[in-house]
Amino acid sequence: MVKNLIFWLVITVVLMSIFQNFNTNDVNNHKVDYSTFLSEVNQDQIREAYINGRMISVTKKDSSKYTTYIPINDPKLLDNLLVKRVKIIGAIPEEPSLFISILISWFPMLLLIGVWIFFMRQMQMGGGKGAMSFGKSKARMLSEDQIQTTFADVAGCDEAKEEVSELVEYLKEPSRFQKLGGKIPKGILMVGPPGTGKTLLAKAIAGEAKVPFFTISGSDFVEMFVGVGASRVRDMFEHSRKSAPCIIFIDEIDAVGRQRGAGLGGGHDEREQTLNQMLVEMDGFDGNEGIILIAATNRPDVLDPALLRPGRFDRQVIVALPDIRGREQILKVHMRKVPLSKDVDPMIIARGTPGFSGADLANLVNEAALFAARLDKRVVSMLEFERAKDKMMMGSERRSMVMSDFQKESTAYHEAGHVIIGRLVPDHDPAHKVTIIPRGRALGVTFFLPESDTLSISRQKLESQISTLYGGRLAEEIIYGAKNVSTGAYNDIKIATSLAKNMVTQWGFSEKLGPLLYAEEEGEIFLGRSVAKAKHMSDETARIIDEEVKLLIEINYSRARNILNENIDILHAMKEALIKYETIDAFQIDDLMKRREVRQPKGWIETDTNK
């Protein structure tokens, strides 16, 4: 920063001195045209004329002054002035100094060189570390005092913590392992969906072991200049050796560790040179150096096999989505700084958030706190957590959207059809909440909440899901006729078709085709294994697959139609409840399915609008 200020200060001083050299002493005098000057000479009003090139500084007999400019060379001017007895003073031409002459001739070139150096420094190093330092590592080093994260801050992944806990013991006491001939894994690859806490777990390892922590993203290695990535890899490992024992953490390593020869661009590019250098460095340092490389990715399938072999990343730690107990622990960690009402139960929230990652749960707590802050509450209650969960699962409410009475009615029938089918088909998740308030891009939403974490899905459950997906379209068809069915079921049809196709081609749920895999490979061009899309079936087999998919859809479509026809009274009653209350939960759904009077939702107040 100081060097940049000095650089621009020098340029400013030089420019000011150059401009000052060309200034005249009489720039502030009043200017008059040349014809007026000649007229006043003829009228004998001029006392003195100071001639400096083509500029004349004039002093009149009344002591007033002005300047004028000779537009063309006038040979009679001096004679006229002498005739009128005007005092003539000629300016002595000033020769510029040698320094000014050299500066004027070289200044443009020096300015261009200075600007080039400045911009190269800013673009490449972002802070004045030198214009030729492109190959320096961008890894940021955090000392043991800067890392406050510990295993207590990481929840919901007990198995992963147990896997990496021996790293902490090794970094604290390496001789304990070395004297028995044991070697700690040189590299650990953390694999898991986004938001599961891979980066947080790596920081906790460094925080527990109290060792330096180098962090860098996979995309920071590759630049526009050839060879920069490999140079940065060398520089990073060189610095880490000086700080050993230490941890190097590479986030999103698939940006640089993608399989070589991938895509259409050939096999020799800057990214592959960087990967080759990383492979050499990982295999080059000995285990007793105390350098542990940890990387994180959610795309392990695209990584180069050489990167995953023993001796490099020889251990994979799966950081999966948390189960119900893990979600409860994560919620408790994030609720530490939030004032909570007595009715808040983390276990109930955890039970209602299957499939949520650690990042999702952190966002849930934050959204609940924001809801409470908007209402000027002092504590966050269970109601705010419920509203935050609905927002994350079903989208934000769009109450400003104007819907006609017919649109509300058709949406209510559509959502009621989903709910009724979902409640009456076997092995289906129970309906948790249904609303006709527009949320996100949907006019209405039906949300089914699993009773437990889903590990595998049975054929019966898949067929029940297909029937439920068509429940909305069938409800419209039964009430309004086939010609008046809307396009609102587009996404339902898309999901149902995909499920049926997977059941036939991937999961072996077709009696005619048997338990064989018929799925075509997708995304191969990005992995570099094939440019053309491979086809693993004959035309006749493809025709049979289409027939089986259609048959599966027709069976479940017909089942859903029969269920709605047999429960048409519940369909009408649920439509009325949705129009009145706009949102109903599992308790109201139970009342409707048992043909009882529907209780009012909690906190609902009847107004003239919803009458």
Curated annotation (Swiss-Prot):
CDD domains for this protein: RecA-like_FtsH
Active site: residue positions: E415
InterPro entries: AAA+_ATPase, AAA_lid_3, ATPase_AAA_core, ATPase_AAA_CS, FtsH, P-loop_NTPase, Pept_M41_FtsH_extracell, Peptidase_M41
Annotated Zn(2+) binding sites: H414, H418, D492
GO terms of biological process kind: protein catabolic process; proteolysis
Localization, UniProt: Cell membrane
This enzyme's EC code(s): 3.4.24.-
Keyword Transmembrane helix: yes
Cytoplasmic side stretches: 1, 120-611
Residue ranges, Extracellular side: 23-98
Keywords: ATP-binding, Cell membrane, Hydrolase, Membrane, Metal-binding, Metalloprotease, Nucleotide-binding, Protease, Transmembrane, Transmembrane helix, Zinc
Cofactor binding notes: Binds 1 zinc ion per subunit.
Chain sites annotated for binding ATP: G192, P193, P194, G195, T196, G197, K198, T199
Any Pfam family: Peptidase_M41
Membrane-crossing segments per the record: 2-22, 99-119
Domain of life: Bacteria
HAMAP family in UniProt: FtsH (MF_01458)
Family as reported in the entry's similarity comment: In the central section; belongs to the AAA ATPase family.
Protein name: ATP-dependent zinc metalloprotease FtsH
Species of provenance: Buchnera aphidicola subsp. Acyrthosiphon pisum (strain APS)
